[in-house]
Amino acid sequence: MSTPTRGFFGRNRGGRDPRLPPGQYDVGSDFPVLTAEVTPSIEPASWTMTIDGLVESPRTWSWDELHALPPSRFEGDIHCVTTWSKLATSFEGVSLDTLLVETRPLAGATHLVATSTTGYTTNLPLEHVRDGRAWVVWTHEGHPLPREHGGPARLLVPHLYFWKSAKWVTRITLLDHDEPGFWERNGYHDLGDPWREQRYQGD
């Protein structure tokens, strides 16, 4: 008796995986490398993470201090604006909720800007990084995050297009207004919801 191959499991009748947002395709085991700048080489011992702006207690964590916080794991899907999706993948780090509890956002804080060591920036509404929706991560599939994918640590906001998950993140600044980042100033959507195909301004 023949046995179905792996590729025939979990397909819906329409032939499209329901985990894929409109216009996306499953990249399988690949993890494409896309970046807006030269990939930096950052030693974990010299890396820090700062949360400042509209918070009661601005804070900077060292690599060891961040690792001493309760770990948090994400298992799910990520979606790139260039139309690839990576399904059933995993990252581990610390929930942004944990960092916000320590820094205590002020009542007027509505948005944030994430900044990378390269100077890359991206903006996010504060509500989109709370309640278990965002992380600072340093492992992927159980291995240290490669530098081409943002290592030693990157922001992870998996429910939005992946340019919002800033590589080599080193600072998150809370604001009382929206302040577009690098790609947002160059025509990309301010939010970037893949299920609404918010790739570009006006989408």
Label each residue range with its predicted role.
Residues S2-D203:
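Structured, non-membrane catalytic/scaffold regions adjacent to prosthetic-group chemistry
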